[in-house]
Amino acid sequence: MMNHARGVENRSEGGGIDVVLVTGLSGAGRGTAAKVLEDLGWYVADNLPPQLITRMVDFGLAAGSRITQLAVVMDVRSRGFTGDLDSVRNELATRAITPRVVFMEASDDTLVRRYEQNRRSHPLQGEQTLAEGIAAERRMLAPVRATADLIIDTSTLSVGGLRDSIERAFGGDGGATTSVTVESFGFKYGLPMDADMVMDVRFLPNPHWVDELRPLTGQHPAVRDYVLHRPGAAEFLESYHRLLSLVVDGYRREGKRYMTIAIGCTGGKHRSVAIAEALMGLLRSDQQLSVRALHRDLGRE
């Protein structure tokens, strides 16, 4: 297996925009690679016609544009593909930009299996067999592969492994952080639809029944202290934080960069808010996490 996943030097001489062209065999993971680049902050254009690539670059070079990193996914829709790629390279060279080419590939057996699982036909298959379509594409793209800056063989890579390869090459500091949202809510208003994990903290005494705490929220120090000093609260936070650390590590390995943890109480005003804030503080001890708290039902009463 060839997997030249290493840091690839930015060769844009103009300094205005960095361009990556993602190409390779159909079914080898171009789309997944594009999603990873998007997560890393790249502006991604999927299946952009070759004649429009230079226009997109010109837009990125224009004053006021926020596009500094452009990734374009190019697939083999015509037999003039190699010539199209050469034309794009030549046009960009006139703008002092040398695009980096990422070539995605996989073994024939792997590609056949993926196509059969997805029940799709190969773009070059036509009246031929699937294997013949794959072979034709390999021959067509051989010149592109020979000059690619980065070749990634996805035959034995999981989605997480492919993500790691792309991040090592283009992520700068070795990869993006995982964004975690700790969301408090009230069960009487329904479950958050986007939650990855839901925890019920109604086992803790409700400050609603304490007259001086009732009008306050879980963000107030008096309510926070009341909730966090109830029996079992500290033990719960310690245990749940330890559990979440294991889950977050698994999410990272699988390439998932966004996670929502929902913490619920009756109305989403006292207990869930205090626990969510405390949990956010614990999770922020992990420097690879970007953590925020969201209080969905606060002020709803």
From Swiss-Prot:
The keyword ATP-binding applies. One of its GO terms (cellular component) is plasma membrane. Pfam families: PapZ_C (PF22740), RapZ-like_N (PF03668). Keywords: ATP-binding, GTP-binding, Nucleotide-binding. InterPro entries: P-loop_NTPase, RapZ-like, RapZ-like_N, RapZ_C. The keyword GTP-binding applies. SUPFAM superfamilies: P-loop containing nucleoside triphosphate hydrolases. HAMAP family: RapZ_like. Displays ATPase and GTPase activities. This is Nucleotide-binding protein Rv1421. It comes from Mycobacterium tuberculosis (strain ATCC 25618 / H37Rv). The lineage of its organism: Bacteria, Bacillati, Actinomycetota, Actinomycetes, Mycobacteriales.
